[in-house]
């Protein structure tokens, strides 16, 4: 089987070329061709010797996930569905803003964490994505979006907030991050690359040490009782441990704050009392809040908080001195909004039926 060079960061690519008896600078050349020029085969790499191109064609390949579908929302949001084999697809979403272009990338096919308000979690878990499948999302989007009239990349920011829990696919995510940050890859700043986690504490500590990019934490609750209910991972790493891990992460983080994401669920976590509990919870963690109006999906069992509840919640946090944003709903018409990245995942665990039975039982 040929080696897919898209799975390698510069360090791995350099080792690969050394094993072939080639000089280290060849790795930099090939990396630039793959990620900066969007080359899909070695014959395009005209500054490589013909003999090396022949050798690479025999031993290696550049295998990018196949594009299954591309959609564009009325608000400019773009979504690509990529084929990762065996009938599975993963989604990546581009969100344009006036001052930046953000790409939201998936790290797994499905998700095993079972956050109760997340449509991806309801699909069950299939497998981790390879580094090539993760970076391939940026490759496709970069090719589609191109550069601005000033010759700047349209994609200026990357957030690992798509399907899956990035920390549960740690090694492949770190390899992909390394390619994103490398000047021979995409040359992104650590400050402009964000990994989101539901709170896998040991992996947060590892990421701080090996690849400290910006960090977002899917918090969604102000106390353990509510978080245990909606983010089951909290039973393993409760809020006290999570807050301590956030403090440790900031020692090496490229930004001096953590972003806490908080989905607003009507009657569950959106009361003034919850906002006041939050203030107490994060008092020792420099942070910003991103409030996310819930995006309803079939059989979710949840409703979006009212605009009034969101406003009151935001005001309480702001009056306590926190920077708070309320996420605008983007890409609703192409199911690209936060929590809707269900993809074309086969529901191997039949969790949809399980949730329907639970809801029927609650209504009876």
Swiss-Prot record:
<feature type="binding site">
    <location>
        <position position="118"/>
    </location>
    <ligand>
        <name>[4Fe-4S] cluster</name>
    </ligand>
</feature>
<feature type="binding site">
    <location>
        <position position="295"/>
    </location>
    <ligand>
        <name>S-adenosyl-L-methionine</name>
    </ligand>
</feature>
<dbReference type="GO" id="GO:0070475">
    <property type="term" value="P:rRNA base methylation"/>
</dbReference>
<dbReference type="GO" id="GO:0030488">
    <property type="term" value="P:tRNA methylation"/>
</dbReference>
<dbReference type="GO" id="GO:0051539">
    <property type="term" value="F:4 iron, 4 sulfur cluster binding"/>
</dbReference>
<dbReference type="GO" id="GO:0002935">
    <property type="term" value="F:tRNA (adenine(37)-C2)-methyltransferase activity"/>
</dbReference>
<feature type="active site" description="Proton acceptor">
    <location>
        <position position="91"/>
    </location>
</feature>
<keyword id="KW-0819">tRNA processing</keyword>
<dbReference type="InterPro" id="IPR004383">
    <property type="entry name" value="rRNA_lsu_MTrfase_RlmN/Cfr"/>
</dbReference>
<keyword id="KW-0808">Transferase</keyword>
<dbReference type="InterPro" id="IPR040072">
    <property type="entry name" value="Methyltransferase_A"/>
</dbReference>
<keyword id="KW-0489">Methyltransferase</keyword>
<dbReference type="Pfam" id="PF04055">
    <property type="entry name" value="Radical_SAM"/>
</dbReference>
<feature type="binding site">
    <location>
        <position position="196"/>
    </location>
    <ligand>
        <name>S-adenosyl-L-methionine</name>
    </ligand>
</feature>
<dbReference type="InterPro" id="IPR048641">
    <property type="entry name" value="RlmN_N"/>
</dbReference>
<feature type="binding site">
    <location>
        <position position="115"/>
    </location>
    <ligand>
        <name>[4Fe-4S] cluster</name>
    </ligand>
</feature>
<feature type="binding site">
    <location>
        <begin position="218"/>
        <end position="220"/>
    </location>
    <ligand>
        <name>S-adenosyl-L-methionine</name>
    </ligand>
</feature>
<keyword id="KW-0698">rRNA processing</keyword>
<dbReference type="GO" id="GO:0000049">
    <property type="term" value="F:tRNA binding"/>
</dbReference>
<keyword id="KW-0411">Iron-sulfur</keyword>
<dbReference type="GO" id="GO:0005737">
    <property type="term" value="C:cytoplasm"/>
</dbReference>
<feature type="disulfide bond" description="(transient)">
    <location>
        <begin position="104"/>
        <end position="338"/>
    </location>
</feature>
<dbReference type="InterPro" id="IPR027492">
    <property type="entry name" value="RNA_MTrfase_RlmN"/>
</dbReference>
<keyword id="KW-0963">Cytoplasm</keyword>
<protein>
    <recommendedName>
        <fullName>Dual-specificity RNA methyltransferase RlmN</fullName>
        <ecNumber>2.1.1.192</ecNumber>
    </recommendedName>
</protein>
<feature type="binding site">
    <location>
        <position position="111"/>
    </location>
    <ligand>
        <name>[4Fe-4S] cluster</name>
    </ligand>
</feature>
<dbReference type="Pfam" id="PF21016">
    <property type="entry name" value="RlmN_N"/>
</dbReference>
<comment type="similarity">
    <text>Belongs to the radical SAM superfamily. RlmN family.</text>
</comment>
<feature type="binding site">
    <location>
        <begin position="164"/>
        <end position="165"/>
    </location>
    <ligand>
        <name>S-adenosyl-L-methionine</name>
    </ligand>
</feature>
<keyword id="KW-0949">S-adenosyl-L-methionine</keyword>
<dbReference type="InterPro" id="IPR007197">
    <property type="entry name" value="rSAM"/>
</dbReference>
<keyword id="KW-0408">Iron</keyword>
<dbReference type="GO" id="GO:0070040">
    <property type="term" value="F:rRNA (adenine(2503)-C2-)-methyltransferase activity"/>
</dbReference>
<feature type="active site" description="S-methylcysteine intermediate">
    <location>
        <position position="338"/>
    </location>
</feature>
<keyword id="KW-0004">4Fe-4S</keyword>
<dbReference type="GO" id="GO:0019843">
    <property type="term" value="F:rRNA binding"/>
</dbReference>
<comment type="function">
    <text>Specifically methylates position 2 of adenine 2503 in 23S rRNA and position 2 of adenine 37 in tRNAs. m2A2503 modification seems to play a crucial role in the proofreading step occurring at the peptidyl transferase center and thus would serve to optimize ribosomal fidelity.</text>
</comment>
<dbReference type="InterPro" id="IPR013785">
    <property type="entry name" value="Aldolase_TIM"/>
</dbReference>
<feature type="domain" description="Radical SAM core">
    <location>
        <begin position="97"/>
        <end position="333"/>
    </location>
</feature>
<keyword id="KW-0479">Metal-binding</keyword>
<keyword id="KW-1015">Disulfide bond</keyword>
<dbReference type="GO" id="GO:0046872">
    <property type="term" value="F:metal ion binding"/>
</dbReference>
């Amino acid at each position: 089987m040929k080696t897919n060079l898209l799975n390698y960061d510069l360090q791995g690519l350099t080792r690969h070329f050394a094993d072939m008896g080639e000089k280290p600078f060849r790795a930099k050349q090939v990396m630039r061709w793959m990620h900066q020029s969007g080359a899909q085969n070695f014959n395009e790499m005209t500054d490589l010797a013909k003999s090396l191109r022949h050798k690479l064609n025999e031993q290696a390949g550049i295998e990018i996930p196949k594009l299954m579908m591309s959609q564009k929302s009325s608000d400019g949001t773009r979504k690509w569905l990529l084929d990762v084999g065996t009938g599975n697809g993963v989604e990546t979403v581009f969100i344009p803003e006036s001052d930046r272009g953000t790409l939201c990338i998936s790290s797994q096919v499905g998700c095993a964490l079972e956050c109760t308000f997340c449509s991806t979690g309801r699909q069950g878990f299939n497998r981790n994505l390879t580094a090539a499948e993760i970076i391939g999302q940026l490759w496709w989007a970069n090719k589609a979006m191109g550069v601005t009239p000033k010759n700047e990349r349209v994609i200026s920011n990357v957030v690992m907030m798509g399907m899956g829990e990035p920390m549960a696919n740690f090694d492949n995510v770190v390899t992909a991050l390394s390619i994103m940050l490398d000047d021979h890859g995409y040359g992104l700043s650590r400050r402009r690359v964000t990994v989101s986690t539901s709170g896998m504490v040991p992996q947060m500590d590892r990421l701080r040490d090996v690849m400290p990019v910006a960090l977002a934490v899917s918090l969604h609750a102000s106390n353990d009782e509510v978080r245990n209910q909606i983010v089951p991972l909290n039973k393993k790493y409760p809020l006290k441990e999570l807050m301590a891990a956030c403090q440790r992460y900031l020692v090496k983080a490229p930004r001096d704050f953590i972003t806490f994401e908080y989905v607003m669920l009507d009657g569950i976590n959106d009361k003034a009392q919850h906002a006041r509990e939050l203030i107490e919870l994060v008092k020792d963690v420099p942070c910003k809040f991103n409030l996310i109006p819930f995006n309803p999906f079939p059989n979710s069992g949840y409703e979006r908080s009212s605009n009034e509840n969101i406003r009151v919640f935001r005001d309480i946090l702001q009056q306590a001195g926190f920077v708070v944003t309320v996420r605008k709903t983007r890409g609703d018409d192409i199911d690209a909004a936060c929590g809707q990245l269900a993809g074309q995942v086969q529901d191997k665990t039949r969790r949809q039926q399980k949730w329907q039975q639970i809801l029927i039982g609650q209504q009876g």
